[in-house]
């Protein structure tokens, strides 16, 4: 039937009470498992929940996401522009598009110049910069609810 039933969501780690949580997956198909996870995290008193994926397909439409957002189960959905996104998604207050055009252009440029892709793919320093900005609470207004 195309569905992948999830038997259980298990959380391993410290208490998440009052913390911001990021759920990361490669793809949102219908979004059911992501929304179930977000709901469970909110029940565990997560402060904010951010859903992130590479490919946001939204095969069952946006109604379930709209309802879950209205119920406060998540704060933002971030997905790349590496696949078709339904036009109505852009009007949703919870949606953030991660523009990958510069990254893809860099990959093409590296390949055209026969240069190793390792520098383009080694994003550890960028991640550390984002975490530092977050920890300093600077330049993160895009993460707040509208």
Write out the residue ranges for each language-model feature.
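PRPP-associated nucleotide enzymes
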Residues: 1-146
């Amino acid at each position: 039937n195309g569905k992948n039933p999830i038997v259980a969501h298990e959380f391993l780690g410290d208490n998440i009470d009052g913390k911001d949580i990021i759920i990361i997956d490669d793809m949102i198909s219908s979004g059911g498992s992501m929304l179930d996870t977000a709901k469970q995290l909110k029940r565990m008193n997560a402060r904010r929940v951010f859903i992130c994926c590479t490919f946001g397909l939204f095969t069952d439409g946006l109604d379930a996401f709209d309802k879950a957002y209205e119920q406060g189960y998540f704060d933002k959905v971030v997905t790349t522009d590496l696949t078709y996104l339904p036009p109505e998604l852009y009007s949703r207050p919870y949606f953030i598009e991660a523009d990958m055009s510069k990254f893809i252009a860099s990959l093409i440029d590296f390949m055209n110049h026969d240069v190793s892709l390792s520098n383009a793919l080694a994003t550890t320093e960028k991640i550390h910069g984002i975490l530092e900005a977050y920890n300093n609470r600077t330049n993160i207004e895009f993460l707040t609810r509208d």
